[in-house]
């Protein structure tokens, strides 16, 4: 079965402008576009000059001054990148207001230093996220929002020589509301072939989408909608809107976007950079544990168990079980006495360490100190000196290199001897490998991976932690997606391991300087191609030279710093395909966003994960209570009506409580189905791929994307196009899909269809 979208691009023309008049108006709009590109180039050059000027400055000796200089240079470089990201499709619309003023809407805001705008202000171009640009997306005949005409541009050419090839007007003071879902500008965008990456939708955001995009920052909002409603695009554009509206706050903390798979992250990862936003980190549920990339899946019951919040207590016990008591006394031979760590001594030290309330590694120091103090006391007692006999005291003091006291020892001598003995024993223990071995044995330095692997591969440890014995697996088994939040929780319970010796100051400063240059050079590469003679930071400063003027820290964009820091706390969290996340996933993600500012995107009718959400309340209530709201998208912009008719039939059978979204368009082509013998399936799939590929054009010039979705890709022959499982295809879009063995997919889980 296949589904193909019509890729015809509509020719749009304002019905009120004809012939020469239309051409003159189109040329006038092109002239405006050229002026906007000139303003953009000037602002970009000014920002670039500021970045270079700040970097070239020699800051004073104060570390804070040097840091502020570097931060300023980096911010200006980010501004340059954002401006240059706006070049393609710079301006895409115009608003004519009831007061006679005209506003142009585009990818970034621009000011006109000459103040020559028709409304008398210096705003030459409105950023699409600005409040003043909202009527471009929301004005209707019923609610015109002070607008009499909205104009959509079709842009041709490449920046900075773009031109207005066509335009379409929505006249909002007539009896025809052309701002509906049948808007030709929208349909033209929807019928355009898909590429290997998602495109932004700033030119065609619809009113119901814009309302969600502009919701306030605080709080948790669940965006629910069926396939094709633009949930992901809305969430990403909401991120861009929030970064614009709350720049100072979110620029420091960043935004975390969680997608269902690495393929999905790759598909959507270019949208925000194209909108000029870089303070965003993308990840997947299988990467929630720092340094771990998990893709394997557990059996359904195991995944369901691991996804339960009951695992929090299991993991806490698993860590506590590693704080052990010796089965038999541990002997430590010091210079003058032998001491022993027996169960009672270890238990007393363990109790003192646990009473601190610190996590495992932080409490290890308390355990070491408590155990050392107990052994020092034991050593003093075992020395057996007669501390009431002055000559004996004097002899002990001489042994402790306090011979200057001679035989004249007063009543305080016993206390002095005791204190000196304690000091000597503390020093002996500090140097003694046997003591450190005992601490490591009873309160070891651990990694999350070691704890979880030991737990899941040991029936005894599982039983001691109160875990389901069904979790048992072999030692060293590959990490699964459901293991990732468990590993992250263990990292929280363990805390950072004891720090290794720090690198030399020179090395740290040199590494820091090299990173600064790498960041700025990377930003410059984004700008490459405009001026081959343009100087770059590395043209006039090296890492060694720059190191001499840097603070010994790390200067990088918020995304780079956040991605490398497990304990980073984000200002906003976006979760796509949120219905697939377990309660444990939500637990560790919300820890990363203490402000509880969250945009969750999903469709309960498409849930297939064993530990995913049956209802939103079921998965969100344990971690959020009732502090969340739900918004729905009801219009299917992407999927043609012919395809949705099939999907709706499946939905009615297994989830009749869910209503499919209404498609805005038809293609006139019905999906086809072929039934072949089992031994001919592979050949039939290959033939279908060739046939549908030919309809899209030559392989190196195809207008659109083609993919195969199959329950078992390994059973198919090598194909020249992507082959996905229903799970790996989640969130992706294609122009043509060859769906293999849909009945087998339905039997496994109807939601996968």
Task: Indicate where each model-derived feature is located.
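P-loop NTPase Walker
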Residues: 2-19, 23-51, 55, 179-181, ...
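Hydrophobic alpha-helical scaffolding
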Residues: 191, 254, 258, 298-308, ...
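Alpha-helical structural signal
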Residues: 2, 47, 51, 79, ...
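A residue-level signal for conserved active-site and pocket-lining positions in enzyme catalytic cores
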Residues: 315, 490, 643
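Extended, charged low-complexity regulatory segments
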Residues: 1-202, 207-211, 545-546
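ATP-hydrolysis module of ASCE/P-loop NTPase motor domains
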Residues: 297-385
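Conserved helicase NTPase catalytic core signature
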Residues: 344-572, 581-585
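Conserved helicase motor core of SF1/SF2 NTP-dependent helicases
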Residues: 248, 253, 262-306, 494, ...
């Amino acid at each position: 079965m296949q589904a193909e979208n019509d890729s015809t691009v509509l020719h749009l023309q304002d019905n009120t402008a004809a012939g020469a008049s239309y051409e003159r108006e189109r040329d006038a709009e092109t002239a405006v576009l050229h002026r906007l590109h000139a303003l953009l180039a000037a602002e970009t050059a000014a920002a670039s000059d500021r970045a270079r000027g700040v970097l070239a400055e020699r800051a004073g000796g104060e570390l804070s001054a040097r840091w502020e200089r570097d931060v300023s240079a980096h911010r200006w470089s980010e501004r340059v990148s954002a401006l240059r990201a706006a070049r393609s499709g710079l301006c895409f619309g115009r608003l004519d207001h009831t007061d006679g003023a005209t506003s142009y809407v585009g990818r970034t805001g621009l000011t006109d230093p000459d103040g020559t705008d028709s409304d008398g202000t210096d705003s030459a171009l409105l950023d699409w996220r600005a409040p003043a640009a909202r009527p471009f997306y929301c004005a209707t005949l019923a609610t015109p929002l002070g607008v009499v005409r909205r104009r959509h541009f079709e842009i041709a050419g490449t920046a900075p020589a773009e031109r207005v090839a066509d335009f379409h007007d929505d006249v909002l003071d007539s009896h025809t509301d052309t701002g509906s879902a049948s808007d030709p500008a929208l349909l033209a965008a929807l019928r355009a072939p898909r590429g290997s990456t998602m495109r932004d939708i700033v030119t065609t955001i619809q009113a119901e989408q814009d309302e969600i995009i502009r919701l306030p920052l605080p709080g948790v909002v669940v965006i629910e909608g069926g396939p094709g409603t633009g949930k992901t695009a809305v969430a990403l554009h909401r991120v861009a809107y929030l970064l614009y509206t709350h720049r100072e706050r979110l620029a420091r903390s960043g935004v975390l976007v969680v997608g269902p798979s690495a393929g999905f992250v790759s598909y959507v990862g270019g949208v925000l950079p194209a909108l000029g936003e870089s303070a965003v980190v993308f990840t997947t549920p299988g990467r929630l544990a720092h340094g771990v990339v998990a893709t394997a899946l557990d059996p359904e019951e195991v995944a369901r168990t691991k996804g339960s919040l009951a695992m929090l207590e299991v993991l806490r016990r698993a860590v506590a079980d590693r704080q052990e008591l010796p089965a038999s006394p541990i002997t430590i031979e010091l210079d003058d006495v032998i001491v022993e760590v027996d169960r009672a001594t270890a238990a007393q030290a363990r109790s003192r360490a646990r009473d601190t309330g610190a996590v495992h590694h932080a409490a290890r120091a308390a355990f070491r100190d408590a155990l050392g103090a107990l052994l020092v006391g034991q050593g003093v007692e075992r020395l057996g000196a007669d501390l009431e006999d002055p000559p004996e005291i004097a002899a002990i003091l001489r042994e402790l290199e306090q011979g200057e006291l001679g035989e004249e020892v007063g009543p305080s001598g016993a206390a002095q001897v005791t204190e000196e003995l304690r000091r000597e024993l503390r020093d002996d223990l500090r140097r003694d490998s046997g003591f450190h071995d005992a601490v490591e044995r009873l309160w070891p330095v651990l990694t999350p991976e070691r704890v979880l692997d030991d737990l899941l591969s040991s029936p005894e440890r599982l039983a001691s932690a109160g875990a389901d014995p069904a979790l048992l697996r072999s030692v060293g088994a590959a990490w699964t997606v459901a293991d990732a939040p468990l590993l992250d929780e263990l990292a929280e319970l363990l805390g950072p391991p004891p720090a290794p010796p720090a690198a030399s100051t020179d090395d740290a400063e040199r590494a820091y300087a090299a990173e600064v240059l790498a960041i700025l050079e990377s930003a410059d590469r984004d700008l490459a191609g405009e001026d081959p003679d343009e100087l770059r930071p590395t043209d006039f400063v090296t890492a060694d030279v720059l190191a001499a003027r840097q603070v010994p820290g790390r200067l990088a964009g918020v995304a780079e710093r956040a991605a490398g820091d497990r304990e980073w706390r984000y200002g906003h969290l976006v979760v796509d395909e949120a219905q697939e996340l377990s309660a444990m996933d939500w637990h560790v993600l919300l820890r990363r966003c203490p402000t509880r500012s969250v945009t969750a995107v999903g469709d309960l009718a498409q849930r297939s994960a064993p530990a995913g959400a049956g209802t939103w309340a079921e998965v969100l209530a344990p971690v959020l209570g009732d502090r969340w709201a739900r918004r729905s998208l009801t219009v299917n912009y992407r999927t043609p009506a012919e395809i949705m008719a099939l999907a709706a039939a499946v939905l009615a059978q297994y989830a009749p409580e869910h209503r499919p979204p209404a498609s805005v368009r038809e293609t006139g082509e019905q999906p086809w189905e072929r039934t072949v013998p089992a031994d001919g399936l592979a050949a039939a799939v290959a033939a279908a791929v060739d046939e549908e590929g030919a309809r899209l054009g030559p392989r190196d010039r195809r207008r659109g994307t083609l993919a195969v979705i199959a329950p078992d890709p390994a059973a198919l022959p090598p194909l020249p196009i992507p082959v996905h499982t229903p799970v790996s295809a989640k969130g992706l879009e294609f122009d043509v899909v060859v769906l293999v063995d849909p009945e087998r997919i339905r039997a496994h889980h109807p939601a996968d269809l």
